[in-house]
Structure formats: C-alpha cells, structure tokens
C-alpha cells in the first residue's frame, strides 16, 4: 500500500509562467508534458470511505488506481494510493463494467512534471483551470513551497474529480470536463 501526500493550489497563467522560471532557477529537472484522460468509476464499495477507482490513459499507456482518503488536519492531503500499469485499458473497462462499475466522472488534463528538492511538482491544465501540485513527504513539500515562493498561493482543497463535478458537463449519469477541439490544439 502506498500513500499519496500532496498540496494543491489554483493558479493563473501568469503564475504558471513564473513557476516555470522559478523551477528552472532552482535547478529542477523537467520530466516532460503529457495529455491525460482520467475516468473515475462508481460502483459497489466505493460510496464509503471516500474511495476512488480511476483508469488513466496517458500517451498510449494506462494506469489503474485505487485511492482512499486518510484522516489529516495539516492541510496536506494524504491518501492511500495503489496503482498498476494496464496492458489493455479497453479490456479493463469491460471487466469493470461486468462487475457493476460504471464511468461517473471523466476529466482531461495536460500535465507538466518537474522534480526539485526531493518532491514532484506538476503544473496541470484542466478545462476549468490551472493548478500546481507538490507531491512528496511533508517537510520537502513545505521546503518546495518556500523555494518556489508559492506558500502564499491559494490552496485548493478539492480533488480534480470534485472540481469536475462542479465545473463539468452532465451527460446522463456521467459528468465530463474535456477540452474543446480548439483547446486541444493550443
């Protein structure tokens, strides 16, 4: 069992550009940018304990993840996180469907990943906003906040699925946040 420890902030486009400059100045390692499609499922056992099953498709590969919230009052999110690579995402989706799990939330994301000061810093663009997440252990997260001068930024307590439910488009039982064709090209 793994544990995800992270802090998230909502930022604007000017702050995104400043963060890239601060990351470069701090000697951060750029790990590249990717486009993701994230599908979260509803079904048996997920309604209790804030549990999530997610199938993420990224650049021709897929990752299947189980997440479960853990109690914490520090302002840093902690969640159980178990994930595995999937060879055939379509087959897994069929298996989940056969077991009674159905897609409930879908969101697309452009993610730029950096490594600095012992943490992973990601700059995320979703159809409804720009965000930065810092993931690692608690002390290095706080150190990275200071190094990158984002400790005064507005924290975002909601998860991307929660934000998708607020800002996405309802399509029957499914809520989606997808880029338009024009947004995908930019």
Enumerate the language-model features and the residues they cover.
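N-terminal strand-loop-strand beta-hairpin
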Residues: 1-119, 154-186
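Short, well-ordered alpha-helical microsegments
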Residues: 16, 141-142
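A contiguous pocket-lining binding segment that forms or flanks enzyme active sites
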Residues: 123-127
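Catalytic DNA-binding helix-loop module of base-excision-repair DNA glycosylases/AP lyases
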Residues: 130
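Long, well-ordered alpha-helical scaffolding segments within enzyme catalytic domains
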Residues: 142-154
